[in-house]
Amino acid sequence: MPQTRSQAQATISFPKRKLSRALNKAKNSSDAKLEPTNVQTVTCSPRVKALPLSPRKRLGDDNLCNTPHLPPCSPPKQGKKENGPPHSHTLKGRRLVFDNQLTIKSPSKRELAKVHQNKILSSVRKSQEITTNSEQRCPLKKESACVRLFKQEGTCYQQAKLVLNTAVPDRLPAREREMDVIRNFLREHICGKKAGSLYLSGAPGTGKTACLSRILQDLKKELKGFKTIMLNCMSLRTAQAVFPAIAQEICQEEVSRPAGKDMMRKLEKHMTAEKGPMIVLVLDEMDQLDSKGQDVLYTLFEWPWLSNSHLVLIGIANTLDLTDRILPRLQAREKCKPQLLNFPPYTRNQIVTILQDRLNQVSRDQVLDNAAVQFCARKVSAVSGDVRKALDVCRRAIEIVESDVKSQTILKPLSECKSPSEPLIPKRVGLIHISQVISEVDGNRMTLSQEGAQDSFPLQQKILVCSLMLLIRQLKIKEVTLGKLYEAYSKVCRKQQVAAVDQSECLSLSGLLEARGILGLKRNKETRLTKVFFKIEEKEIEHALKDKALIGNILATGLP
């Protein structure tokens, strides 16, 4: 059995050698006949390396010499490894040939890349020199036209809108007197280490918070040795929550437990410490701290007058007579009475000065016409004197003009655009745009739909508005609580035999009227104590509702 296996192995490789000998004999027909011993020597001779196997499997000079002389028969399959020579590795051979080709061609590629890069640099330099000498080239015209298509007049409008925002500006014209009073008060008490209290009152949008914020920012750079704490009381859930908020700002740590005697004692000890810094406590929307017995407000106004106190209290609210009407006990104690400073509504000339000062920061060519600015100031000063409203109206008018200009510019063909050398004159905001915005904001919100269509104002909301109007006339006050309003509303519904909604739905109706801009709400932790007031003139409401039969009857008969 071993002999048969060895013979079988010899017969497998024998035809390959026989095939190579036959080919060699065909080429060398003039040679003598070889003996069987010579056959074995031929197989071991160096000529076997030059036998015409597949050229792709040969390496070195043998491959170059024998590549043209292809064998007449088909070469062995390349995928099988056993067909090759004993020590030949096809993958290694292919990789060596490929690497040699790379090493031969890589220097030329690098040189070509350098030459190509030098050509590009030279062309860029030439193009730069040409553009400096001649500015009217076709590529430049196309680029400028594409840029002008989207940025023709948008930059000036965006800059104007940025300066007309309601943030605290660097300059506050028309409030020099009030700012001098606040600045002198703070310098006197901070530099003199003297406690005190100041109450700022005025309608919304008259610059109370803006003036105080600007002065405090300036004093931080000028004076040292004081700490500022600013709290907006609208963010507090209850009036008692102001004490944990103050303790958190002073101690720089969270206070989880509710305000009690221990916390009050801790705050008073911190404010009366001998080596402690001066504390400037600013409470915005201070009238939201209204509580039973006004204990919170009395405690806050008594803190500056404790022995060795270094607290400077500044309260800000819309109510003019807060200290007189809500805190009458402060009148009995003269030293606890705060210094009062009222911010009157802005006049027409002051609003014009503020708007022009903002617009002059952008460019000399104003986006708004002078007549449009005068018209906006006159309308706003006649209603409320709120400068924030004037800024919003102007910004909205600029947005309308900007949208019109962008739509026209985008739809204009590229060939119709003016040349870049011609100056671009932006479209200015005129009286028409200001009037359009004011009619949207301050127009007749009570106007109903025309041509016999269904009213856009629901019946329950109209009855609630009539009840509020009659209640204000009867009590001769401007604000009523939601509880009293609901009682009057229920009486009117019973008299007119109309189904009334419950108190929670009455609050929802008030919220819808607030969204329309008809009512204003001063919310409280207790729903019945939420204050309701009109945001538009009563004559306008009466004129819009008196034509209807049911509403006219309610207004004529009054409250039952």
From Swiss-Prot:
Q: Where are the Phosphoserine residues found in this chain?
A: S45, S54, S74, S106, S127, S419
UniProt keyword Cytoplasm, yes or no: yes
User: Which SMART domains does the record cross-reference, listed alphabetically?
Assistant: AAA, Cdc6_C
Resulting phenotype, S54D: Does not change protein stability after CHX addition during mitosis
- What InterPro entries does this protein map onto? AAA+_ATPase (IPR003593), AAA_16 (IPR041664), Cdc6/18 (IPR016314), Cdc6_C (IPR015163), Cdc6_ORC1-like_ATPase_lid (IPR054425), ORC1/CDC6 (IPR050311), P-loop_NTPase (IPR027417), WH-like_DNA-bd_sf (IPR036388)
Q: Which family does it belong to?
A: Belongs to the CDC6/cdc18 family.
According to the entry, the disease involved is: Meier-Gorlin syndrome 5: A syndrome characterized by bilateral microtia, aplasia/hypoplasia of the patellae, and severe intrauterine and postnatal growth retardation with short stature and poor weight gain. Additional clinical findings include anomalies of cranial sutures, microcephaly, apparently low-set and simple ears, microstomia, full lips, highly arched or cleft palate, micrognathia, genitourinary tract anomalies, and various skeletal anomalies.
UniProt name for this protein: Cell division control protein 6 homolog
What is the organism of origin for this protein?
Homo sapiens (Human)
Upper taxonomic classification of the species? Eukaryota, Metazoa, Chordata, Craniata, Vertebrata
